[in-house]
């Protein structure tokens, strides 16, 4: 997910994106716990994407 894509989205779309990322993160953690996750770098990427989306949500909220 690129910063340009996130900057062009409105607040509602960012909240939907955040919800999807949180669900994906939960699934990845469950796969890791059951030893089914083969690519553990997905966890870090997901965490960074969540932080990125939360940052844009905070910026959009501060602008209003």
From Swiss-Prot:
Keywords from the named record: Ribonucleoprotein, Ribosomal protein
The UniProt record lists the keyword Manganese: no
Record keyword Ribosomal protein present: yes
CDD domains the UniProt entry points to: Ribosomal_L29_HIP
Record-annotated disulphide pairs: none
Single GO MF descriptor: structural constituent of ribosome
Gene of this entry: rpmC
Protein name: Large ribosomal subunit protein uL29
Pfam short name (any one): Ribosomal_L29
An annotated GO cellular component: ribonucleoprotein complex
